[in-house]
Amino acid sequence: DDAVANGVHAISGVVDS
């Protein structure tokens, strides 16, 4: 999954806290 600056994975859509 590509983690974006906002912490959201663009592919899986999982949010990184």
UniProtKB/Swiss-Prot annotation:
The keyword DNA-binding belongs to this UniProt entry's keyword annotation: no
Record keyword rRNA processing present: no
The record's family statement is: Belongs to the Frog skin active peptide (FSAP) family. Septenin subfamily.
Q: From the Swiss-Prot or TrEMBL record, state where the protein is found.
A: Secreted
Regarding tissue, the record states: Expressed in skin glands.
Identify one Gene Ontology CC term for this UniProt entry: extracellular region
Key words, A-Z: Secreted
Indicate what this protein is called per its UniProt record.
Answer: Septenin 1g
**Lineage summary:** Eukaryota, Metazoa, Chordata, Craniata, Vertebrata
Superkingdom as given in the UniProt entry: Eukaryota
Query: Function, please?
Result: May act as an antimicrobial peptide.
